[in-house]
């Protein structure tokens, strides 16, 4: 075996090293359930986890040339480096956000488990993104899904968390079964599962169309596209808020990137068929999610339908199947990451301090916690696509990608839905600044880790809006060197 091939997997190997280090540190620092004194006194694993993840991100940010390893099972491209870096940044923010929750007495001794499970999920996404073979893709998918199920049910003594975990596991099992059924059809008609070999065997016959339908349905569950979205609101509401934020951004972003990669590589000969399917799924996702979001009272359920709608917008980048669409997708995920995690950071700290998650509970938040209200407003404006915030530019680029690919009607419908989404995002802004509240959320100070996560999200929203040249940078970095 040529061991130099492992150098192409430096990102995965580096992340495995981070996981092992945190695992060992947790063994040395965490008191057992009987309250015994730990061997090494470390107040929190958050700081070591954040430092290690930051080093991991910086070290692996330097690009290489496109390459394959292990007979084509593993593929490396500069674009993959970017999407992995984006996922790393989101994961770091989630780790910072989770610190306040993990300080609770019932979760304090499980800090190490949370970090190891979170990074194990990220590792699975890495393998999924770099897969050059459907077997590698499926292994990565399951490596991401199984720890995620444990994270969703992490608050096992809360009924809602356990229920959400059960629903997520059942949904993951069902979607994996659909995927495997589709992959078996692909193998049966082509005799191979290598991404580079499959286009020569894809003819668009009826069995391959059925294979695509099952594959797309399985991925639709992962991305929360309509009509595969029914689990989303219940799981988002029941899971711990930090886990919900991770599920809504990191998991969705990686799955969308992988879906586009496979559609462009494997199913390129069936482009007319999958574009038609994606056309209607995109319209349904954006429209139905908007209608349901208007009716929500629980803020986490509200963000669930917002996430479904945003998944529809992300599909605008996928449907064109172009380099411009790929760049727009990555940029959109980056902006969505900053805005969505900003909202969830506010929800998380408010929930920890007041146990309130209803939209009406946020009435008058500006009077008691003006900084939190300001950050929430910036994030919601960005999600709505209001200029000059980053969300406006991300929507502009992804709309242009679809428009240049000839999907003019789809872009028009998406624009109408964007106007509709302004209404329900501004409802929360109205609640915070205008609506009176006899029992408002009390004034409180956030812990330092939460402050850092809020600052990072705020800077991301503002900087990505001002420096829209980042979009060109992503494109040059990725396609200037080869995808």
UniProtKB/Swiss-Prot annotation:
Its membrane topology: Multi-pass membrane protein
One of the protein's GO biological processes: ATP synthesis coupled electron transport
Catalytic activity: a quinone + NADH + 5 H(+)(in) = a quinol + NAD(+) + 4 H(+)(out)
Keyword Manganese: no
Species: Bacteroides fragilis (strain YCH46)
Gene: nuoN
TM region(s), chain numbering: 11-31, 45-65, 82-102, 112-132, 134-154, 168-188, 209-229, 253-273, 274-294, 302-322, 330-350, 373-393, 396-416, 454-474
The protein, known as: NADH-quinone oxidoreductase subunit N
Record bears the keyword Electron transport: no
A molecular function (GO) term: NADH dehydrogenase (ubiquinone) activity
UniProt KW keywords: Cell inner membrane, Cell membrane, Membrane, NAD, Quinone, Translocase, Transmembrane, Transmembrane helix, Transport
Cysteines joined through disulfide linkages: none
Reported function: NDH-1 shuttles electrons from NADH, via FMN and iron-sulfur (Fe-S) centers, to quinones in the respiratory chain. The immediate electron acceptor for the enzyme in this species is believed to be a menaquinone. Couples the redox reaction to proton translocation (for every two electrons transferred, four hydrogen ions are translocated across the cytoplasmic membrane), and thus conserves the redox energy in a proton gradient.
Subcellular location: Cell inner membrane
Family from the record: Belongs to the complex I subunit 2 family.
EC top class named in words: translocase
GO CC term (a single one): plasma membrane
EC identifiers of the protein: 7.1.1.-
């Amino acid at each position: 075996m040529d061991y130099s091939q492992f150098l192409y997997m430096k990102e995965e190997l580096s992340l495995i090293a981070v996981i092992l280090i945190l695992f060992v540190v947790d063994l040395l620092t965490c008191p057992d359930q009987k309250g015994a004194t730990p061997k090494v006194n470390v107040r929190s694993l958050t700081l070591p986890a954040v430092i290690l993840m930051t080093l991991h991100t910086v070290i692996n940010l330097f690009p290489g040339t496109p390459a394959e390893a292990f007979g084509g099972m593993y593929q490396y491209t500069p674009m993959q480096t970017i999407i992995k870096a984006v996922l790393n940044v989101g994961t770091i923010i989630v780790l910072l956000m989770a610190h306040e929750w993990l300080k609770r007495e019932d979760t304090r001794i499980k800090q190490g488990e949370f970090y190891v499970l979170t990074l194990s999920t990220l590792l699975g996404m890495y393998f999924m993104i770099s897969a050059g073979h459907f077997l590698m893709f499926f292994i990565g998918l399951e490596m991401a899904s199984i720890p995620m199920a444990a994270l969703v049910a992490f608050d096992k003594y809360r009924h809602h968390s356990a229920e959400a975990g059960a629903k997520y596991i059942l949904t993951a099992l069902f979607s994996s079964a659909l995927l495997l059924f589709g992959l078996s059809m692909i193998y049966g008609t082509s005799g191979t599962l290598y991404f580079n070999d499959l286009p020569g065997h894809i003819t668009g016959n009826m069995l391959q169309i059925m294979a695509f339908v099952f594959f797309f349905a399985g991925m639709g569950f992962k991305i929360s596209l309509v009509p595969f979205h029914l689990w989303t609101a219940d799981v988002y509401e029941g899971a711990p808020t930090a886990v919900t934020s991770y599920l809504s951004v990191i998991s969705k972003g990686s799955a969308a990137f992988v879906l586009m990669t496979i559609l462009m590589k494997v199913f390129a000969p069936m482009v007319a068929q999958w574009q038609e399917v994606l056309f209607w799924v995109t319209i349904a996702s954006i429209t139905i999610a908007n209608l349901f979001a208007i009716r929500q009272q629980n803020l986490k359920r509200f963000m669930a339908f917002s996430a479904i709608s945003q998944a529809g917008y992300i599909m605008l980048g996928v449907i064109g199947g172009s380099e411009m669409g790929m760049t727009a997708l990555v940029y959109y995920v980056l902006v969505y990451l900053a805005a969505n995690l900003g909202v969830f950071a506010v929800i998380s700290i408010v929930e920890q301090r007041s146990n309130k998650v209803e939209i009406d509970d946020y009435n008058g938040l500006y009077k008691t916690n003006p900084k939190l209200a300001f950050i929430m407003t910036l994030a919601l404006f960005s999600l709505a696509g209001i200029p000059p915030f980053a969300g406006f530019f991300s929507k502009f680029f992804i709309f242009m990608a679809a428009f240049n690919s000839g999907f003019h009607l789809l872009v028009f419908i998406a624009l109408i839905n964007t106007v509709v989404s302004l209404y329900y995002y501004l409802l929360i802004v109205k609640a915070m600044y205008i609506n009176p509240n006899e029992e408002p959320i009390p004034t409180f100070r956030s812990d330092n880790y939460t402050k850092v996560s809020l600052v990072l999200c705020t800077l991301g929203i503002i900087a990505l809006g001002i420096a829209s040249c980042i979009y060109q940078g992503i494109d040059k970095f990725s396609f200037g060197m080869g995808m």
